[in-house]
Curated annotation (Swiss-Prot):
Record Pfam families: Prominin
Organism: Rattus norvegicus
Signal peptide coordinates: 1-27
GO molecular function terms attached to this record: cholesterol binding; growth factor activity; transmembrane signaling receptor activity
One annotated Gene Ontology cellular component of this protein: cytoplasmic vesicle
Membrane spanning residue stretches: 107-127, 154-174, 435-455, 473-493, 780-800
Annotated protein name in UniProt: Prominin-2
Glycosylation: residue positions: 270
Parts of the chain on the Extracellular side: 28-106, 175-434, 494-779
GO biological process: negative regulation of caveolin-mediated endocytosis; negative regulation of pinocytosis; positive regulation of cell projection organization
Tissue expression: In the ventral prostate, expressed in glandular epithelial cells.
Quaternary structure, from the entry: Binds to cholesterol.
Keywords: Cell membrane, Cell projection, Cilium, Coiled coil, Glycoprotein, Membrane, Phosphoprotein, Signal, Transmembrane, Transmembrane helix
Coiled-coil positions: 637-674
Length: 834
């Protein structure tokens, strides 16, 4: 039974292995190579993105909109393109009436300012003379019923006017200081902006070279991956082929075990058959002799009644099985002589070791390929190497730098003058704001003391110091108002004229695009101010188009008129470079000549088994004879019968004969029959195993030989298919590093290095500096100061009117007449000199 299991287990494993060893379609396993790592490229110096210049929010920002709306009412005329064109090209031919017509709103404001400048000081002078002669600004002549209402109304209007002056003065102070604080940084930002633009083209080659040098990053990463590519590819091949190779090797191992077990059984059958035949030849004569003697003895007259059972058994005492009828197996054994010559277990272990060492084998075979790949990898692609040298910017760089340098040099004196005059304006603004503050203080003190004096005075005709002091403070405020009215209106109009024209003529047209349209129209600018030429723009691109394209991130060579066109995509086309690497790697083939799966000795053993005819042996003939007893009768039972008969005999001679026959029969059974029975018992399992396994063994042997032969032809192609897929995966990953570099370079060049965004940013910064940081607070300053200046007039009127009520009222007779009653003087008698 144990021998049967020893053969059935290998056969079951062999059948399963043959089923699993059929070739399968192999899919690419790219995940085993790992993901593409993210390459970190060093930022190129000087390409750090600069945020656009923005103005910090200010609490009085809402005031800017009010000023702009006021200026839009003052200046209703559109942008004077023809007037500016004439002014720039031929200043002497500019007609005054055209200027006046365009500046009509400002002329009206100038007339108003002139009237203010003329009338207010003259009025102040007249009022001063009148006060000196005590004819103006005196007292209330009479007390009447509506006096309290008039006084309250005047004080209310004066207080409101003073509050308006106070608000305007605070806003004027704030805008004056804010304008001064913004002017310095704004003026300093102009040369900084021009200086940054000078390097817009000249610094590009140096930055491009820095970008080209970083091609070493993907080179280093790919070189690092190449160090382990052989082992990685070998692991992929091993993982893909093990589902094919391992079952075949397991089948070979199982078939070797089955072959060994079958030969052992066959040898046992052959040896046992020979012994059985020889033993039966020696057993037949003594059995026949015993039978004849027993029949003669038991058929005598004395044994008619008592010997029927023994006689029946003695009659059956003859050979049962005829072992000479069993077919010979020595011919099959002769064909299997020396089998198994190969050590299948050792062979399978060696093949397993060879297959498991596949990663090392591939690595060793790829050493020369990796060396060649690294040598080719160390070289830079032609396009990347010439990335900086091919940039055609020499002429444009010179023209651009000269234009910006000239503009910077010409602008410095004007910028210094702007700072100097701004300082003067700031000082004068502080002085005049202080004067307005003085007027406000005088008004507030006058109102406070005057009201206090009114409550403290019992009789309106009585003089009271607090009321008198209040009236004097109000008159002092009036004096200061007349005194500072002229410088106030002059400063307001001067700043209004400058700031208003900057806003309406420059900023408004800049925002609407009319300024760009004027600059781009041929003939509007003199030849020396041809911006398209000075900036080196392409002939078909205007300044406004350049601004819009640069704001969108267009590259320099698409906007500037460079020496030659610059094709970035052509320089970043590294397909030729990567194609050489791909071709070198894809041409690699793995040689698996050491992996045989079945060595020649094992193949000969299996072929010998296949042609041995093991399955053709008539095992049924063996079973027919094995199932028969060696002797038909039970010799032990017959011996007992004879011994019983011997005990029943009275005659000693017969008793002795029967006992002797029984003893000899037992002896024959033990010496001849029992060994034959043992041989039959030994032969039975071997025959049954061979009967059931020999056909399967032959089929599996044929299948295994066919599969091994087919795999020997298909395995190289399957291996190369796996290698090709794995190589594609490896190349895809490595090309990903070069793609990262190309993407980074394209983004770096187009968005940071060779982008003309600094040009549009400079224009936006210029608008921010001129209009938002300087013009807006400047205009807010004169607006607030003008507010205060014109509120001085109602302040003067209400202060003069109110001051009368703070002085004592003159007495008059009880009369309803409005005229003052003259006191009657009684004439005195005087002595006359004669």
């Amino acid at each position: 039974m144990t021998r049967t299991l020893d053969l059935m287990v290998p056969l079951l494993g062999l059948s399963l292995g043959l089923a699993l060893s059929l070739p399968r379609a192999v899919a690419a396993d790219c995940g085993s190579l790992g993901r593409v790592e993210h390459l970190a490229f060093a930022p190129v110096p000087g390409t750090e993105p600069t945020a656009p210049r923005v103005r910090a929010p200010w609490p009085l920002d809402s005031l800017y909109g009010t000023v702009r709306r006021f200026l839009s009412v003052v200046q209703l005329n559109p942008f004077p393109a023809e007037l500016i064109k004439t002014l720039l090209n031929d200043p002497s031919s500019v007609k005054t009436d055209e200027v006046v017509r365009y500046e009509a709103g400002y002329v009206v404001c100038a007339v108003i300012a002139g009237l203010y400048l003329l009338l207010v000081p003259i009025t102040g002078l007249c009022f001063c003379c009148c006060r000196c002669r005590r004819r103006c600004g005196g007292r209330v002549k009479t007390e009447h019923k509506a006096m309290a209402c008039e006084r309250g109304t005047l004080m209310t209007f004066l207080l409101l006017t003073t509050l308006m002056l106070l608000i305007g003065m605070v806003c004027a102070f704030a805008t004056n200081q804010f304008t001064h604080s913004q002017t310095g940084p704004s003026v300093e930002a102009v040369p900084e902006t021009l200086l940054s633009l000078r390097g817009l083209v000249s610094d590009v080659p140096k930055k491009l070279q820095a970008v080209a040098d970083q091609f070493s990053s993907p080179q280093k990463q790919v070189s690092k991956d190449l160090d382990g590519v052989g082992e990685n590819l070998g692991n992929i091949i091993h993982n893909q082929l093990k589902s094919t190779v391992y079952p075949v090797l397991a089948s070979v191992h199982g078939l070797g075990q089955a072959l060994q077990v079958s030969i052992d059984h066959l040898q046992s059958v052959n040896a046992t058959s020979v012994e059985l035949r020889e033993g039966q030849q020696h057993l037949g004569p003594p059995v026949q002799a015993h039978r004849e003697r027993l029949l003669a003895l038991l058929q005598e007259s004395w044994c008619h009644e008592n010997c029927k059972g023994a006689l029946s058994q003695a009659s059956a005492l003859q050979l049962g099985a005829d072992f000479s009828q069993m077919p010979p197996v020595d011919d099959v054994l002769h064909r299997l002589q020396g089998v198994p010559e190969a050590n299948f277990s050792s062979m399978v272990q060696e093949e397993n070791a060879t297959f498991n060492n596949l990663p090392i084998l591939v690595h060793m075979q790829m050493v020369s390929v990796v060396k060649d790949l690294k040598k080719a990898l160390a070289e830079q692609p032609e396009g990347v190497r010439m990335l900086a040298q091919a940039f055609p910017g020499s002429e444009a760089t010179s023209r651009w730098s000269q234009a910006l340098e000239g503009l910077e040099q010409r602008s410095r004196p004007y910028l210094q003058d702007v700072q100097r005059y701004e300082t003067y304006r700031w000082i004068l603004g502080c002085v005049l704001c202080s004067a307005i503050l003085l007027v406000v203080i005088c008004n507030l003190l006058g109102l406070s003391l005057g009201i206090w004096g009114l409550f403290a005075r019992e009789d309106p005709s009585h003089s009271e110091t607090k009321g008198e002091a209040g009236a004097r403070f109000l008159m002092a405020g009036v004096a200061f108002s007349f005194l500072f009215a002229a410088p106030l209106i002059l400063l307001v109009f001067a700043t209004f004229l400058v700031g208003g024209n900057v806003q309406t003529l420059v900023c408004r047209s800049w925002e609407s695009g009319e300024l760009y349209e004027f600059v781009d129209t041929p003939g509007n600018l003199p030849p020396s101010m041809n911006l398209s030429y000075l900036l080196g723009l392409r002939k078909n691109i205007s300044v406004f188009q350049a601004y819009r394209q640069c704001k969108a991130g267009t590259a320099l060579w698409k906007v500037l008129q460079l020496n030659d066109s610059y094709d970035l995509d052509k320089h970043l086309d590294i397909k030729q470079y990567t194609h050489e690497l791909q071709q070198e790697l894809q041409s690699f083939k793995v040689d698996l000549k050491d992996l045989d799966l079945l060595n020649p000795a094992a193949r000969q053993n299996l072929e010998a088994l296949q042609s041995s005819g093991l399955e053709k042996i008539h095992y049924r003939d063996f079973l027919v004879q094995i199932q028969k007893p060696v002797v038909k009768t039970d010799m032990g039972q017959l011996a007992k019968e004879l011994e019983g008969l011997a005990q029943a005999q009275n005659e000693s001679l017969r008793r002795q004969q029967l006992q002797e026959e029984a003893r000899e029969l037992r002896s024959l059974y033990q010496e001849k029959v029992v060994p034959q029975e043992n041989l039959v018992a030994k032969l039975n399992p071997s025959i049954r195993v061979l009967e059931s396994s020999a056909p399967k063994l032959q089929v599996n042997t044929s299948d295994l030989l066919d599969i091994v032969a087919r795999l020997k032809g298909e395995l190289p192609a399957q291996l190369n298919h796996i290698l090709r897929n794995a190589t594609e995966c490896f190349l895809t990953r490595e090309m990903g590093y070069f793609s990262q570099y190309v993407t980074w370079v394209r983004e770096e060049v187009t968005q940071h290095i060779a982008t003309c965004q600094p040009f549009s940013k400079a224009l936006d910064d210029g608008h921010m500096i001129l209009c938002d940081m300087m013009a807006n607070p400047w205009n807010a300053f004169w607006f607030c100061l003008g507010w205060c200046t014109f509120f001085l007039i109602p302040s003067i009127i209400f202060a003069v009117k109110t001051s009368k009520y703070f002085r004592p009222i003159r007495k008059r007779l009880s009369s309803t007449s409005s005229e003052e009653t003259q006191l009657f003087h009684i004439p005195r008698v005087t002595s006359l000199k004669l």
